[in-house]
């Protein structure tokens, strides 16, 4: 069958554009068959699946085949498998755990490209399980000398920390060491990881400030790393104020001299964050930002405006000097530039320039479209309402601005404009008369009814109707207002607006009746009455004929609303109809109820606090977690009770008549009616409720109505604020205010000093309604931390590492079994010492294992028996136990035998780091490693890793390092070859794998370094490396009788030497500890007086070492015996270099 390649697949997809999905599904079926073939077919199939996945198709069904291709030994196949895994694997992929071993294996591959693939793939598919299993391996890679692998390993650490936060504490010391690495790219990777970590918890990384400051001052051309360091300092400076003072000079130099705009921007951001109180530096930053804003590049202009916005929050006056530059940005073609310029306007606004700024925005509003138009409307209202209208000196001007904004079609800010109209009229009493007249004109505007969608600009009619009705005492032409309220086209408006129209038409009629009868209107203040009296000189008085005409208009036009499809509109229309009928009847009887009618709408209103709902205290005894109506005790509503629907509606209708009518702008009438309707259905099925519940619900309803500022009637709620609005200081205006008219007057600026009209004194009422028991502390906003619940941000790096701060290490089950056996043997041995006359307590217990593990245990025991010598014979005691306890006896003997055999300690790879050359030309550091032996013949292998750095300004050629020691001392098994060319200021590594033939004569290794500078004579240096003899000492536990046998045999320890350590106040336990730790020499027997002990060890070439140590008056003497005096001299030298410390 013909098999498609990737090229064929792509060509086929392009040729089947009309039925692309069908063609791809056909290819997937073919690929499923190819995945059953050999590895080459699987590789091609996985490659095609990767491309199909990029087109959006799911290939999770092939995850196992992808893992198979990843495990292929062929690099080309492995690369395709890793790419497919990076593209398709996620946290929900089950087979991802099968790739753990393969990734770990590729980390240590001799082919660096395979290590690259594994690291790149891990960064994409890292899960919690993978991070936990591979964290230790990544940490091991940080010790590699291969720079490219090291950089990738450091970068992958960040993904490890995100998925497995517990690895941060044990891994952070090694990450911190890489900040001192001589390779700049390694330092850059470390800075990147630390910068990302510091965004979560900056305090953890304050101790790194000195190292980072040194990198900042010493780095010149690595702009990417400098950007990261500067961003890191921006996170640290808020937590350490002294750091900001230290950064002033280097940041000033970078801002003045750096050609990198990105670095300049980050430096300015850091200055804003941590050095905002340094005025010269802030002026420098603002001047640099001005050059960015004036640049032709749109990206630079955007960054300049963004940074200027951050400075404006701290130094608004300094930014306001550049108002003209920001206003010019409003004319930019890029909408993102214009939006950023809008964000800067609040910091540049004052009483003097608010008129110019608003009219500038209105000019742009004429040509604006879409989202930008909405942003301009929102920004105009934001500028004018800042600080409770602190910049507004002419509220009539602001009312006209709002009216002009309400005439913009297809805007979504109808509710915002409506709320502003309500807020201004409620707070500023002197503007109420003017606003009322303007709202009547607004109600007649047919444009607002052309798009009667809920939430649109028709929402302004809600506020207009409410203002006209609430302050209808200022209405001198009630007929105009009622005709606007009851015009037929009102029926197309949303229901909540219609209901407000109904209620406020009654308010207008009530005030007209009161005026016609000469009654005092309680809602008007004294100042308002004087103004009203002056304006009535030119206006017609309201007569009884006008009232009768108003009554006829309402009755004639109310019929359409009493038959409305909206329940709330119909209810209020019927209510008004009944009230007017009652008014007509009482009037015919000669009674005047105008005072009673006007008394329904005389309650004083105050704005509601913006956080009033949040500050409502929880009543004592109220449990918010307890069910109000337990669902378990609710009776289900039966569907066959259809005859109750009329009772339900009647109940709802009666309940609505008992409600006080709303006048506020909340738009919740529909929701209230639906809620009442749903609750009435429930009440009909549970009609006989307890009187206590009825009383509680009544009190709850009255409390809500008392706290509603727009609820008319009822008792006046208790106010917390005792401030008298009349005692608020009067704002002195700069000039007279001219008369404004809708349509033309909104285009004029704020009044100037040349105006001739009498001054008006505006008083802004800042009183707000708050619930009882509210506290001032409740006014604080809760600042949400993005990483508040992040596990990585909660880790404290300042605490010292503990025993629990270790990385997870996966072990085979046989290793776990061996460890348990050793623990049991040690426990048995300890118990035998404590009670030698009784058998160990562990003899009565045996571990129950699964059949799969039992063979492994047998193999382990056989291996242990073959590698360890038999235990020394011990005296056996006679046992008188019955035969039934033979199994127990056998277990006891085997346990005691295991206790006698000391398992060899695990092989520890020792490491020493030395500087072997540091002159004007080269610096060479050497890492000496004791290689873990694969067999007995490899027990003396040493690996040397030399890092060679060219310190000169010229290139070196023919660089080589060669061993000079004779073959009878050591032999070079493998090396990295000639170094070759070493560029100026560059570094490289040279490795040597040596086999030490004679451990006694190879304490000093000799090498020759040759190099040829480009413009100087050849260089020859002799290198000398001292090998620690502790590399060749094997820790051996030896019984006392064997130790005595070695001392008695002639020739095994014939040479003897002595040394003494004085003046350190040493103790025998400390000497025993240091000899075991630093020289691997184990104690054989310690005298009970604690002043004498014997020690034993042997070399890797089976030289016996016996030692007797005596302590007297804080001085320690060492008597050493070995086969050769040269060995004694080496040991004396090693003992002299021991570091004795009690820590």
UniProtKB/Swiss-Prot annotation:
Annotated SUPFAM superfamilies: ARM repeat
UniProt keyword Ion transport present: no
GO biological process per UniProt: Golgi to vacuole transport; protein targeting to vacuole
SMART domains: Alpha_adaptinC2, BLVR
Biased composition (Acidic residues): 524-540, 666-675
Keywords, in A-Z order: Coiled coil, Endosome, Membrane, Protein transport, Repeat, Transport
Compartments (UniProt record): Endosome membrane
Primary subcellular site in the record, as a coarse category: membrane
Region described as Disordered: spans on this chain: 520-541, 634-692, 704-728, 741-792, 829-899
Biased composition (Basic residues): 653-662
Keyword Signal among record annotations: no
GO cellular-component term (any): endosome membrane
Compositional bias ranges of the Polar residues kind: 840-849
HEAT repeat boundaries on the chain: 129-166, 167-203, 205-242, 245-279, 280-317, 318-354, 356-389, 416-455
PANTHER family per the UniProt record, alphabetical: AP-3 COMPLEX SUBUNIT DELTA-1, DELTA ADAPTIN-RELATED
Chain's role: Part of the AP-3 complex, an adaptor-related complex which is essential for the compartmentalization of the endocytic pathway.
Similarity comment text for this entry: Belongs to the adaptor complexes large subunit family.
Subunit architecture: Adaptor protein complex 3 (AP-3) is a heterotetramer composed of two large adaptins (delta-type subunit and beta-type subunit), a medium adaptin (mu-type subunit) and a small adaptin (sigma-type subunit).
Protein name (Swiss-Prot/TrEMBL): AP-3 complex subunit delta
């Amino acid at each position: 069958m013909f098999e498609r390649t990737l090229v064929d697949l792509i060509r086929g997809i392009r040729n089947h554009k009309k039925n692309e999905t069908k063609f791809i599904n056909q290819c997937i079926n073919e690929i499923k068959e190819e995945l059953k073939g050999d590895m080459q077919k699987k590789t091609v199939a996985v490659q095609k699946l990767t491309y199909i996945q990029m087109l959006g198709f799911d290939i999770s069904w092939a995850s196992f085949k992808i893992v198979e291709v990843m495990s292929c030994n062929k690099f080309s196949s492995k690369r395709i498998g890793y790419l497919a895994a990076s593209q398709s694997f996620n946290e929900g992929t089950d087979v991802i755990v099968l790739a753990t071993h393969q990734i770990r294996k590729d980390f240590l591959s001799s082919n660096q490209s395979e290590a690259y693939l594994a690291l790149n793939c891990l960064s994409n598919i890292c899960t919690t399980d993978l991070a936990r299993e591979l964290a230790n391996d990544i940490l091991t890679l940080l010790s590699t000398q291969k720079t490219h692998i090291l950089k990738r390993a450091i970068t992958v650490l960040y993904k490890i920390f995100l998925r497995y936060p517990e690895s941060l504490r044990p891994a952070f010391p090694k990450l911190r060491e890489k900040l001192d690495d001589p390779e700049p790219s390694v330092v850059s990777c470390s800075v990147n990881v630390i910068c990302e970590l510091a965004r979560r918890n900056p305090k953890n990384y304050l101790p790194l400030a000195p190292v980072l400051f040194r990198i900042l001052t010493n780095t010149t051309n690595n702009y990417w790393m400098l950007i990261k360091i500067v961003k890191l300092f921006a996170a640290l400076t808020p937590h350490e104020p002294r750091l900001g003072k230290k950064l002033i000079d280097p940041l000033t130099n970078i801002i003045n001299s750096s050609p990198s705009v990105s670095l300049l921007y980050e430096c300015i951001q850091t200055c804003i964050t941590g050095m905002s109180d340094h005025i010269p530096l802030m002026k420098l930053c603002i001047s640099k930002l001005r050059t960015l804003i004036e640049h032709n590049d749109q990206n630079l202009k955007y960054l300049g405006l963004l940074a200027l916005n951050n400075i404006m929050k701290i130094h608004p006056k300094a930014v306001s000097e550049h108002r003209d530059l920001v206003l010019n940005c409003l004319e930019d073609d890029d909408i993102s530039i214009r939006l950023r310029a809008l964000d800067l306007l609040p910091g540049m606004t004052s009483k003097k320039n608010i008129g110019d700024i608003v009219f500038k925005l209105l000019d742009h509003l004429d040509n604006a479209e879409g989202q930008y138009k909405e942003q301009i409307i929102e920004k105009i209202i934001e500028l004018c309402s800042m600080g409770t209208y602190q910049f507004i000196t002419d509220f009539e001007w602001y009312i006209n601005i709002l009216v002009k904004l309400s005439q913009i079609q297809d805007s979504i800010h109808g509710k915002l404009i409506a709320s502003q109209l309500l807020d201004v009229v409620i707070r500023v009493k002197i503007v109420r008369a003017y606003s009322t007249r303007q709202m009547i004109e607004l109600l007649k505007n047919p444009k607002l009814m052309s798009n009667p969608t809920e939430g649109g600009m028709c929402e302004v009619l809600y506020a207009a109707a409410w203002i006209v009705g609430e302050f209808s005492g200022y209405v001198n032409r009630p007929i105009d207002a009622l005709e606007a309220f009851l015009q037929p086209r009102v029926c197309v408006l949303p229901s909540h607006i219609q209901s407000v129209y109904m209620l406020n038409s009654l308010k207008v009629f009530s005030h007209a009746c009161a005026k016609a009868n000469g009654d005092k209107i309680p809602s008007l203040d004294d100042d308002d009455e004087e103004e009203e009296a002056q304006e009535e000189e030119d206006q017609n008085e309201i007569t009884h004929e006008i009232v009768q005409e108003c009554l006829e208009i309402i009755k004639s036009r109310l019929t359409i609303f009493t038959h409305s499809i909206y329940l709330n509109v119909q209810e209020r229309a019927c209510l008004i109809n009944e009230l007017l009928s009652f008014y007509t009847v009482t009037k015919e009887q000669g009674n005047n109820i105008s005072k009673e009618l006007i008394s329904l709408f005389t309650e004083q209103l105050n704005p509601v606090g913006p956080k009033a709902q949040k500050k409502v205290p929880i009543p004592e005894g109220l449990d918010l977690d307890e069910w109000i109506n337990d669902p378990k005790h609710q009776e289900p509503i039966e569907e066959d009770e259809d005859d109750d629907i009329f009772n339900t509606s009647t109940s709802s209708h009666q309940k609505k008549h008992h409600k006080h009518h709303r006048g506020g702008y909340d738009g919740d009438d529909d929701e209230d009616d639906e809620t009442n309707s749903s609750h009435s259905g429930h009440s009909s099925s549970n009609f006989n409720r307890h009187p206590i519940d009825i009383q509680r619900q009544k009190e709850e309803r009255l409390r809500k109505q008392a706290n509603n500022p727009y609820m008319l009637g009822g008792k006046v709620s208790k106010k917390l604020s005792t401030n008298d609005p009349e005692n608020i200081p009067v704002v002195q205006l700069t000039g007279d205010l001219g008369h404004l008219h809708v349509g033309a007057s909104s285009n004029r600026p704020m009044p100037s000093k040349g105006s001739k009209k009498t001054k008006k004194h505006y008083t802004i009422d800042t009183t707000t309604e708050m619930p009882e028991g509210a506290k001032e502390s409740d006014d604080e906003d809760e600042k949400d931390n993005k990483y508040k619940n992040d596990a990585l941000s909660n880790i404290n790096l300042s605490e010292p590492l503990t025993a629990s701060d270790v990385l997870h290490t996966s072990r085979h089950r046989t290793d776990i079994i061996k460890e348990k056996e050793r623990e049991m043997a040690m426990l048995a041995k300890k118990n035998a010492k404590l009670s030698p006359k009784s058998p160990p307590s562990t003899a009565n217990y045996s571990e129950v294992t699964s059949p799969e593990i039992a063979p492994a245990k047998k193999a382990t025991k056989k291996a242990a028996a073959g590698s360890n010598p038999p235990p020394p014979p011990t005296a056996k005691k006679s046992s008188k136990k019955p035969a039934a306890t033979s199994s127990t006896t056998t277990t006891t003997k085997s346990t005691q035998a295991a206790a006698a055999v000391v398992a060899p300690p695990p092989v520890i790879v020792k490491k020493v780091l030395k500087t072997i050359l540091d002159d004007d030309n080269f610096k060479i550091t050497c890492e000496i490693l004791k290689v873990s032996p694969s067999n007995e013949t490899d027990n003396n292998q040493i690996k040397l890793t030399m890092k060679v750095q060219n310190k000169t300004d010229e290139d070196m050629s023919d660089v080589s390092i060669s061993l000079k020691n004779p073959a009878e001392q050591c032999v070079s098994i493998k090396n990295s070859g000639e170094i070759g060319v070493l560029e100026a200021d560059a570094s490289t590594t040279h490795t040597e794998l040596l086999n030490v033939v004679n451990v006694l004569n190879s304490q000093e290794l000799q090498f020759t370094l040759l190099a040829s500078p480009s413009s100087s004579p050849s260089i020859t240096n002799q290198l000398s490396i001292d090998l620690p003899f502790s590399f060749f000492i094997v820790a051996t536990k030896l019984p006392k009788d064997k130790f005595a046998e070695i001392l008695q045999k002639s020739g095994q320890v014939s040479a003897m030497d002595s040394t003494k350590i004085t003046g350190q106040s040493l103790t025998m336990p400390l000497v025993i500890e240091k000899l075991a730790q630093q020289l691997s020499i184990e104690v054989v027997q310690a005298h009970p007086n604690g002043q004498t002990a014997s020690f034993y060890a042997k070399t890797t070439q089976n030289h016996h070492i016996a030692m007797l140590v005596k302590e007297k008056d804080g001085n320690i003497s060492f008597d050493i015996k070995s086969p050769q005096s040269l060995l004694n001299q080496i040991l004396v030298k090693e003992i002299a270099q021991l570091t004795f410390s009690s820590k």
